[in-house]
């Protein structure tokens, strides 16, 4: 798990999921299957997706930004 900051709050994400090919494929295919995106949120945020959605205001677009921040945090960890 990695910890990262978004909108002044601390969040955790599963770094292993964020760097997994199957997960990346599911994200890219989410346009064809909307449920895939929700499964991805659940996987990345270790089941805390609804809690995190409430913490960031409940908007899907903001959850997308949170997911992007998680990817960036995983990338920063991989560089170190």
Identify the residue ranges that each predicted region occupies:
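Short acidic-hydrophobic surface loop/beta-edge motif
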Residues: 1-7
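Short, surface-exposed, charged amphipathic helix/loop patches that serve as local interaction elements
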Residues: 7-10, 14-80
């Amino acid at each position: 798990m990695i910890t990262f900051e978004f909108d002044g709050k601390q969040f955790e994400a599963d770094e292993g999921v964020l760097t997994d090919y199957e997960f990346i494929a599911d994200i890219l295919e989410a346009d064809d299957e909307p449920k895939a995106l929700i499964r991805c949120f659940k996987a990345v945020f270790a089941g805390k997706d609804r809690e995190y959605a409430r913490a960031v205001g409940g908007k899907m677009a903001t959850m997308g930004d949170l997911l992007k921040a998680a990817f960036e945090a995983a990338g920063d960890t991989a560089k170190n």
